[in-house]
A protein has these predicted regions:
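Well-ordered secondary-structure scaffolds
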Residues: 5, 10, 17, 173-176, ...
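A glycine-rich helix N-cap at a beta->alpha junction
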Residues: 123-149, 219-225, 229
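Phosphate/diphosphate-binding glycine-rich loops and adjacent basic-rich segments that engage nucleotide
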Residues: 144-193
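Glycine/serine-rich anion-binding loops at beta->alpha junctions
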Residues: 77-116
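Short beta-strand segments
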Residues: 109, 143, 151-154, 184, ...
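Acidic, glycine/proline-rich low-complexity segments that act as flexible tails and inter-domain linkers
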Residues: 1-88, 260, 307-314, 428-430, ...
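Alpha-helix C-terminal capping segments
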Residues: 47-48, 93-105, 187-192, 227-228, ...
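Active-site-proximal beta-alpha loop/turn segments in soluble metabolic enzymes
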Residues: 42-45, 123, 161-170, 199-208, ...
């Protein structure tokens, strides 16, 4: 089998066999297929696409290119959530305690933030003492005993995806549905959960900017996940505005605590209840109505907040900061950003707001940058609000006052003003089950 023949076959619109796809993934992973041939192959897929079967085989081959996590000891109870990334997305911090307090087993590997999107691991590391690295035995033992463990991603999960993603990033082949699907799903399948709920973010702060593109991705990932033998549901949620009012790391832990204590932002709470209910539907077999009721009661009874404390304590975190969020890292400068004009906020570009937060120190430009856990933004008004000139729109938190002017400029670029009340937007666009 020669790689050049397979590139030619796909270039001419042919359908690759299972063996041909596995040959490509194996050869690229071990280095026998060079970058220039894999780049050419990625471009042929970009233009010619793949069938669902080809995409499923590609996903499976990438999943098995490195280590996989065996969660079979937890049976149907093992469940995971994956977000396609957004701004202010602290849902894992809220959903994990809800689901694990009701019998779900969440053995979760999460990523770090890059660019305008935040990462769950960075948020958790803003809790003093929290350990994001555990041995395999300690990881499994904690899931067994507590019901949840969240750590950073392992070094040798899906090495084929790591190599291919880096190549796609510099060859203009990121926006290919089969390649996006196989990239996301290979990582999720390698992480071992029996059931997976995908939070597909759609809008200005998301990878998928339009509902049409978001729906295509959601449907593709659900089909491929099911073809690979897992229970998969996708929730399509709105990321045209940041989720909740807090953007940053310690700031988002604070907001997660507010939700679990029953007095959080209604929009954020609503999205988390929807995600948790779908996870409980898959792992416990409950009807959605019952799962929703149980998730709501886990918050109102305090059960989910107590579970959060058990989880954080098990990984070495200082639980005192959950009981008193003022003990979390706080920025030395808290600057009130004022509205330059009166009117209705018609649109907030979530990506730009995420970029503003990153400028303050809450995010990274490159993967080696060090973040400031205290930096970020607290929104005081959101899309739909009527404001007067000089009213506080947001509070910028930073330990680097020299970044304020740049961060303020980018934040104000994110806002589109209007004279009348804007149309309300849905929080959830829909749920894909097949």
């Amino acid at each position: 089998m020669r790689m050049v023949d397979l590139i030619e076959k796909k270039r001419d619109g042919g359908v690759l066999t299972d063996d041909e796809i596995r040959f490509i993934v194996r050869g690229f992973t071990d280095g026998s297929i060079p970058d220039y041939q894999m780049s050419a192959f990625a471009m042929t897929v970009f233009y010619k696409g793949m069938t669902d079967h080809e995409t499923a085989v590609l996903t499976d081959a990438m999943m098995h290119s490195g280590d996989t996590v065996d969660l079979s000891r937890f049976g149907d109870k093992s469940v995971d959530k994956h977000s396609t990334g957004g701004v202010g997305d602290k849902t894992t911090l809220i959903v994990a305690p809800i689901v694990s307090s009701l019998g779900g087993k969440m053995a979760k590997m999460s990523g770090r933030g890059l660019g305008h999107t935040g990462g769950t691991v960075d948020k958790l590391e803003s809790i003093p003492g929290y350990q994001t690295t555990l041995s395999a035995d300690a990881f499994m033992r904690q899931v067994e005993q507590v019901g949840v463990a969240v750590i950073g991603q392992s070094g040798n999960l899906t090495p084929a995806d790591k190599k291919l993603y880096a190549l796609r990033d510099v060859t203009a082949t990121i926006d290919s549905l089969p390649l996006i699907t196989s990239s996301i799903m290979s990582k999720k399948l390698a992480a071992g959960a029996h059931s997976i709920v995908l939070d597909v973010k759609i809008g200005s702060g998301a990878f998928m900017k339009t509902l049409e593109d978001g729906q295509k991705l959601a449907e593709s990932m659900v089909r491929i996940g099911r073809a690979c033998g897992r229970n998969v549901v996708a929730v399509m949620s709105n990321m045209d505005i940041p989720l909740g009012f807090y953007i940053g790391n310690a700031l988002e832990v604070r907001e997660a605590v507010e939700v679990l204590q029953g007095h959080g932002c209604p929009d954020l709470t609503g999205v988390c209840i929807t995600l948790a209910a779908n996870m409980l539907h898959l792992c416990n077999g409950w009807p959605i109505e019952e799962a929703t009721k149980q998730a709501q009661e886990a918050i109102s009874s305090g059960r989910a907040f107590e579970q959060m404390k058990r989880w954080i304590a098990a990984q070495g975190g200082d639980v005192a900061v959950l009981d008193n969020v003022d003990l979390l890292p706080q920025a030395s400068v808290q600057y009130e950003l004022k509205a330059p004009q009166a009117g209705y906020i018609h649109h907030m570009d979530a990506q730009k707001i995420g970029e503003s937060s990153a400028i303050l120190g809450a995010g990274r430009k490159t993967k080696d940058d060090v973040i400031d856990p205290a930096a970020g933004i607290v929104l005081k008004e959101k899309t739909g609000a009527k404001v007067v000139q000089g009213q506080t729109l947001a509070v910028l938190h930073t330990d680097r006052p020299e970044t304020l002017a740049d961060a303020e400029r980018v934040f104000l670029e994110a806002i589109r003003w209007g004279a009348d009340v804007p149309a309300a937007q849905p929080l959830i666009y829909g749920i894909v089950t097949e």
